[in-house]
Amino acid sequence: MKEKLIAAAALAAISPLAFAQSSVTLYGVADAGVEYLNHANASGNSLTRLTSGNMSGSRWGLRGVEDLGAGTKALYVLESGFEIDTGVASQGGRLFGRQAYVGLEHRMGRLSLGRQQNALYDLLINYDPMVLGARYSLQMVDSSFVGRYDNMAKYTGKFGPVTAIALYSFARGTSITSGGATSFAGEVPGDPKSDQALSAGFDYSSGPVGMTAIYDQQQGTLGITGQNTSQRDRRIAVAGSFKFGTTGKLFAGYRWLNGDIGVLAGQPSKRSDVYWLGYQYQILPALSLTAAGYYFNDKRTGRDPWSLIGSANYVLSKRTDAFLNVGYARNKEDSNLGLNGFGISITPGNNQTGVMLGLRHKF
């Protein structure tokens, strides 16, 4: 009898370890399309090409969760971006360039450490009509909307309809090119501000209403010509959405930027505003139509480029959809907003029209 009691006590002591629940999930997105652009180079020539990561960046990843008991979980994410048209790694060739972090999660929130998305990316993806796609979306006018920072400590809390995010990056991993080689900035002894970043934001979503506000700050990086650690870029973004029943959704947002990273002495700061507006309509159970407009107000030059986007998305199955995007970017003087972003496949001062037909599969 005594031996049975001892055995039962021993089993009870180890059972939390023996029966801890854990899981590992392999997931990803394969997104490819054919795109036509005019005014794609300095000679004004057009371009037809196969592209990767259009509505969603092509990626694969591993997501792991372990139940530690008492409502606490350990977790990790390793996510790698790739170019489906060539097979090469994205994000500068990093193995896990999209995300790589480990953390703990409790009912009071999640604390995660590693390379992660900034608060702009986490929150604004729900308020861009084109969901921050790699092309033909809000990130055309500011690539920081899809920013990722190395060396980050991040808190995420969910409290009913409210989500709160606060993060600090010891060095966000800016690319540095020297002698033909590319490296990524890290922490610098004696200068903790080099390449530093911090960000915070909240989201409120209840019923048909959604709204968000975010602050993001980046410091200059040692090792890059024209930068120093006293320089900084500050962004504030606010956005909202409203659902009309089950068929329509309205989006609107604003981004303020003031900064001097990379600005030469005596030159004006990088002061600009971004405004966007869009509407998505579920015309059929499998077919949705989206229209969006993005306006970049450049306070330094007054060149103020803008773009208009139209998109149709047809769901083929639970995991596969086809899309058609049409876009127009308007420039004046030597502004260079293209449908893939500033200075990307666009001739300065010219307007650009683009069409893309693509296929996306999620696994």
Regions found by a protein language model. Give the residues of each.
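Extracellular loop and loop/strand-boundary signature of outer-membrane beta-barrel proteins
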Residues: 45-48, 88, 138-140, 183-188, ...
